[in-house]
Regions:
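SIR2/sirtuin NAD+-dependent deacylase catalytic core
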Residues: 1-303
Length: 303
């Protein structure tokens, strides 16, 4: 069994193909929690909003648990803890806690700088932080931001060159995807300077509502259908065992059938997980994001 695992781990991603598609805008990067955690100091442990780096899901659940008196058994599930906190402090109290953590300008990492250099017309993230936006601003590149809105079947949009947010029906959203990259914050986001615009998919009820809107065509903007259909997906920082992600991708692939393979960079994956995704034309490569970026940059410098 161990030798089989070593053989699987020795398989390298198709770096030249991935770079070629990234450079030409033929890849949609999907950023999970691990993308933000890749910026943390090694062996760091988050304890409170005073820390200079972002929390993991478990650390955030532990913090909300300590603040709310959640009757935990050390098996902390963020969705359940957030649901309990909502019941104890109200939605406003939960959102205030999240805003205090995710609205800050943390140091973004090499991954975010790398993505801000690319021609990708669309970047999808399920993170609440603003690291990818900060990277675009550092590069001086204009970009659109589209945020799933928890409080209504709408999306919040800030267009390239505009400082104003507007609420739009996702089926009627019009954007020039070729004119400026678009960041789609599929699970909401903190909005620095405008906490009333914050939106977080974080409780059990939030996920039920999100999946309901997915079925009703009010969660994902229709304008993203064409790039979803005609692009490779590159998953960075995800644990692909997450059933919520499986449901979301099943819906995307059902509504916008694709003929393109997808790739995932993940530190560890079990055989069942690997087989499940292989059947959906998604190959998991076991490596760190940092090692993946080193290899891709080597290819970029060579070609």
């Amino acid at each position: 069994m161990e030798s089989n695992r070593e053989e699987v781990n020795s398989v390298e991603p198709p770096y030249e193909l991935i770079w070629e598609k990234l450079e030409s805008g033929g890849v949609i990067p999907f950023l999970g929690a691990g993308a933000s955690l890749s910026c943390r100091p090694k062996d760091a442990h988050w304890k409170s909003p005073k820390d200079e780096f972002l929390p993991s899901g478990w650390e955030l659940a532990k913090y909300l648990d300590d603040r709310s008196g959640y009757p935990s058994d050390n098996q902390l599930d963020l969705l359940r803890v957030a649901q309990y906190y909502d019941g104890v402090a109200g939605r406003g109290g939960l959102d205030d806690e999240l805003h205090s953590i995710f609205s800050r300008a943390y140091a973004h990492g090499e991954l975010h700088r790398f993505l801000a250099e690319l021609k990708s017309p669309l970047i999808v993230t399920t993170n609440y932080d603003t690291l990818i936006e900060q990277a675009f601003e550092e590069k001086g590149r204009a970009y659109n931001v589209v945020v799933y809105k928890m409080s209504a079947p709408l999306v919040s949009v800030k267009r390239a060159g505009s400082g104003e947010w507007e609420n739009v029906d996702p089926q009627r959203l019009a954007l020039d995807l070729a004119g400026a990259p678009t960041i789609f914050k599929m699970h909401g986001s903190s909005i620095p300077g405008a906490p009333e615009e914050d939106s977080y998919v974080i409780t059990e009820d939030d996920y039920v509502e999100f999946l309901t809107r997915m079925s009703g065509q009010t969660a994902l903007p229709a304008i993203f259908g064409e790039p979803f259909r005609r692009s490779h997906f590159l998953f960075l920082g995800y644990g692909l065992r997450d059933w919520n992600l499986r449901v979301i991708l099943h819906k995307i692939w059902k509504d916008w059938p694709r003929k393109y393979a997808s790739w995932a960079i993940q530190e560890r994956a079990d055989p069942l997980e690997r087989e499940f995704w292989r059947g959906r034309k998604l190959t998991i490569y076991e490596m760190t994001i940092a090692d993946f970026l080193i290899k891709v940059r080597e290819v970029a410098a060579r070609v």
